[in-house]
């Protein structure tokens, strides 16, 4: 027994010694089971610490913070070691079953030893991770990105605009760029595209800041958006505006930034907000969007860009994308109908998108035809129009400060779609409706009207016409104006606005008693046989119809009517006697009608202040009318059969309030005489010299200081001379500038006698010149005469500097326009025909027009 035991001990020692010599430290096998138990326990502790840490991280991330990189790294390493330990423990049972000699050795010694080494290594690794898994702080504020991407919906035609804006912004000298345009035109989308373009490369900028300003946002609201973008999310309610400005300024002073301000309605004081001055040295820039061009000026931009509606092709492309292919392919007629719907949007992206989406579910021809009918008759009733389009556009209306300016704007909705109305005509309506004080002097009231028009154009509620004398209204803006004028559709009966819709009769469904304004202009109405009781009607527009007859009783019950326009009804030869019942009438326009006489009862219109009888070729006389209208301020007889003669001059002198006179004169002596009567000549704005025969006529630029339009028709005048001096009340009157101050239109037709029109040098503000069928004219400006004028008046050097339209036609002897063809920087149209001796004209002026 003892010998046996002694032998076992001897063998173990021998084996262990051999193993130790051959394979190193036996502890890898001897302590395998203990290390495995320690590894499992430590691993469990590590997983618990990991779970606790993850809970803390989630809480902080929910607050908008970002986990620390070292925390994320630790968690990643824990994840890796968990996987490795799990794989290691899968071999635990196999390796422990191989142990022998009371755990001193393994039946597969090499495998057991290697396993033991891995267990010990993992144990130490896990212990190390456990020791490092103690974090006081697990997350921090997310650093602000240099630029935040903005979501942009499907657009068309944007790339070109972005390119233009980007190129302008990136100019070294550019500091502030204003993007202006009407509501819904895509200004915000353009600004967002500029923002996103910085994602492609910062171009040396440190930060791009986006701020939505909106209409009623105060400075502090702008400041808090900037502070948030700078990563300063602390509460700012207890901090003053000045302190916030200081924080912002201190940070932005050391950065090269781009500040994008969306939807400005008025000037923003950048200094009060804390935006440091933009200089060439710091290179920072500001871009903003606005509906008003005035805001661009108030912000003192050094660059501005108008965002226009889409051209027809691009508008159709956008509309198709919003509608989708299914409706457009559901019937062969729908694409044609869809184009009509798209045309109603007039290129406004907001309308194209909203209406396009609304039409995406309509797949029958009948549905599309119904929509076209709705859009033609009452667009605001179209689904989504009142909810998504009109309210957006209404912000521009709400921003108008003066209630009378708002009334002026709403009045513009009475005209047809795409109709260009003359500014002068619009102002006359407004004055008689009481929107502009008519008691001011003529220049004051007229200037006020032009100021209102300018403000509406700059607010993109009106648009410039093809000619500078006209404006128009975008169709969608017009729908918005009608919607507002009808109290948002609640009082539609107060308006009857159906111009240009091919009516042959006055509609029968009119609520005459509630009616306030009616526009049936540009229709096919020939007869008005009905009578009406319309106690509240103030404006009635019937111009440009086919009127032949108006019922005797039609005007009998319109006591509040102020504005009546019957112009451009060439077959209308008489007015009913009941017109005398229009006791409130202040404005009547009978121009371009066939009126032969004014009814005797016309004298009862005692409140009439504006009478337009221009282009009335059949009107024989107005003797006695003028003296019966004591309040008359505007009398227009330009190109009328009624010419100024001695008796009419005497009658006109009795009009104490006369401010504007347009006249037709046949007699050269009358022309000379009227230029000597201050009260009359000072009011002349347009003058037609018709069938006049005289060797010489003299036009006095002092006397005719208010002349805007001169027409010479069918006359024989050898020479036209200009005088800039005249005697009045015993003293000599002259002007430092010898020319016509306001003369902008000269039209000469069938003039016989003069060889040149050098006197036009005195019309330095001329914008339109038409010379036709005047067979003796050899040149417009004669060299010798021109040089003699410029020698005396050196400030008259370059002729036609403001000319926009030039027409020379049927001038058989015309050899040249001017001896030294001037540059015409503003020329928009040059029309030359049947001037056989003018070979150079066709190439001479278009070149200047395009410069």
Swiss-Prot record:
Keyword Mitochondrion set for record: no
Alphabetical GO biological process terms: defense response
Family matches, as InterPro entries: Apaf_helical, Leu-rich_rpt, LRR_dom_sf, NB-ARC, P-loop_NTPase, Plant_NBS-LRR, WH-like_DNA-bd_sf
Pfam families the UniProt entry points to: LRR_8, NB-ARC, WH_DRP
LRR repeats by residue range: 514-535, 536-557, 560-582, 584-605, 607-629
Single GO molecular function: ATP binding
Residue stretches making up the NB-ARC domain: 139-441
UniProt-annotated binding residues for ATP: 181-188
KW DNA damage (keyword) present: no
Superkingdom classification of source: Eukaryota
UniProt keywords, alphabetically: ATP-binding, Leucine-rich repeat, Nucleotide-binding, Plant defense, Repeat
Family of the protein in this entry: Belongs to the disease resistance NB-LRR family.
Protein's job: Probable disease resistance protein.
Domain notes: The LRR repeats probably act as specificity determinant of pathogen recognition.
UniProt name for this protein: Probable disease resistance protein At1g15890
Organism from which the protein derives: Arabidopsis thaliana
């Amino acid at each position: 027994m003892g010998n046996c035991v002694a032998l076992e001990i001897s063998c173990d020692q021998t084996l262990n010694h051999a193993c130790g010599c051959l394979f190193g430290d036996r502890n890898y096998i001897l302590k395998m089971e203990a290390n495995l138990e320690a590894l499992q326990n430590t691993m469990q502790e590590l997983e618990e610490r990991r779970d606790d840490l993850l809970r803390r991280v989630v809480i902080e991330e929910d607050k908008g913070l970002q986990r620390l990189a070292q925390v994320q790294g630790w968690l990643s390493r824990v994840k890796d070691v968990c996987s490795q330990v799990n794989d290691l423990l899968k071999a635990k049972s196999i390796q422990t079953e191989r142990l022998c000699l009371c755990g001193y050795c393994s039946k597969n010694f090499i495998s057991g030893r290697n396993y033991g080494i891995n267990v010990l290594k993992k144990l130490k690794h896990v212990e190390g991770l456990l020791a490092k898994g103690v974090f006081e702080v697990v997350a921090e504020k997310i650093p602000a990105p240099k630029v935040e991407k903005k979501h942009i919906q499907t657009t068309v035609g944007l790339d070109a605009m972005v390119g233009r804006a980007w190129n302008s912004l990136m100019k070294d000298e550019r500091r502030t760029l204003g993007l202006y345009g009407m509501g819904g035109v895509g200004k915000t989308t353009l600004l967002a595209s500029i923002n996103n373009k910085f994602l492609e490369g910062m171009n040396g900028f440190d930060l791009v800041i986006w701020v939505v300003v909106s209409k009623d946002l105060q400075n502090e609201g702008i400041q808090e958006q900037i502070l948030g973008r700078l990563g300063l999310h602390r509460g700012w309610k207890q901090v003053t505006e000045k302190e916030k400005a200081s924080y912002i300024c201190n940070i932005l002073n050391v950065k090269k930034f781009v500040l994008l301000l969306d939807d400005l309605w008025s000037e923003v004081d950048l200094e009060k907000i804390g935006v440091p001055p933009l200089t060439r040295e710091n290179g920072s820039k500001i871009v903003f969007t606005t509906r008003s061009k005035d805001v661009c000026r108030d912000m003192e931009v050094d660059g501005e860009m108008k965002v226009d509606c889409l051209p027809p092709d691009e508008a159709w492309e956008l509309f198709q994308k919003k509608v989708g292919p299914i409706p457009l392919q559901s019937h062969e007629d729908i694409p044609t109908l869809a184009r009509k719907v798209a045309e109603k949007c007039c290129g406004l992206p907001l309308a194209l998108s909203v209406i396009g989406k609304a039409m995406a579910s309509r797949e029958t021809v009948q549905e599309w035809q119904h929509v076209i009918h709705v859009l033609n008759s009452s667009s605001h009733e179209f689904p989504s129009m009142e909810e998504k389009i009109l309210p957006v556009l209404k912000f521009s209306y709400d921003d108008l400060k003066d209630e009378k300016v708002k009334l002026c704007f709403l009045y513009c909705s009475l005209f047809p779609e795409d109709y260009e109305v003359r500014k002068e005509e619009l102002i006359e309506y407004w004055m008689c409706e009481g929107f502009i004080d008519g008691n001011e002097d003529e220049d004051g009231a007229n200037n006020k009207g032009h100021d209102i028009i300018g403000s509406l154009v700059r607010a993109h509620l009106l648009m410039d016409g093809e000619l500078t004398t006209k404006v128009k209204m975008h169709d969608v803006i017009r729908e918005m104006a009608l919607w507002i004028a009808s109290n948002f559709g609640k009082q539609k009966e107060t308006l009857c606005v159906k111009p240009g819709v091919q009516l042959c009769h006055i509609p029968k469904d009119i609520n005459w008693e509630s009616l306030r304004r009616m526009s049936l202009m540009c229709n096919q109405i020939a007869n008005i046989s009905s009578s009406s009781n319309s106690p509240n009607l103030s404006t009635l527009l019937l111009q440009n119809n086919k009127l032949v007859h108006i019922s005797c009783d039609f005007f009998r019950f319109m006591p509040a009517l102020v504005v009546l326009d019957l112009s451009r009804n060439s077959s209308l030869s008489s007015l009913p006697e009941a017109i005398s019942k229009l006791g409130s009438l202040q404005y009547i326009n009978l121009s371009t009608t066939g009126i032969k006489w004014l009814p005797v009862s016309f004298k009862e219109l005692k409140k009439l202040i504006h009478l337009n009888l221009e282009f009335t070729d059949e009107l024989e006389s107005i003797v006695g009318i003028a003296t019966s209208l004591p309040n008359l301020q505007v009398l227009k007889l330009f190109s009328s059969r009624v010419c100024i003669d001695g008796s009419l001059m005497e009658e006109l002198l009795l009009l104490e309030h006369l401010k504007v006179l347009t006249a037709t004169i046949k007699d050269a002596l009358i022309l000379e005489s009227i230029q000597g009567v201050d009260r009359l000549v000072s009011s002349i704005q347009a003058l037609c010299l018709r069938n006049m025969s005289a060797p010489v006529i003299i036009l006095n630029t002092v006397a005719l200081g208010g002349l805007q339009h001169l027409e010479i028709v069918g006359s024989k005048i050898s020479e036209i001379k200009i005088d800039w001096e005249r005697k009045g009340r015993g003293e000599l009157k002259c002007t430092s500038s010898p020319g016509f101050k306001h003369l902008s239109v000269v039209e000469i037709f069938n003039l016989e006698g003069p060889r040149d029109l050098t006197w036009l040098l005195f019309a330095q503000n001329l914008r339109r010149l038409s010379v036709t069928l005047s067979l003796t004219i050899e040149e417009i400006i004669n060299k010798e005469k021109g040089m003699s004028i410029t020698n005396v008046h050196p400030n008259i050097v370059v002729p036609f500097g403001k000319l926009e339209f030039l027409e020379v036609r049927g001038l058989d002897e015309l050899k040249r326009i001017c001896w030294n063809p001037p540059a015409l920087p503003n020329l928009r149209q040059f029309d030359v025909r049947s001037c056989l001796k003018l070979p150079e004209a066709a190439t001479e002026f278009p070149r200047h027009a395009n410069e």
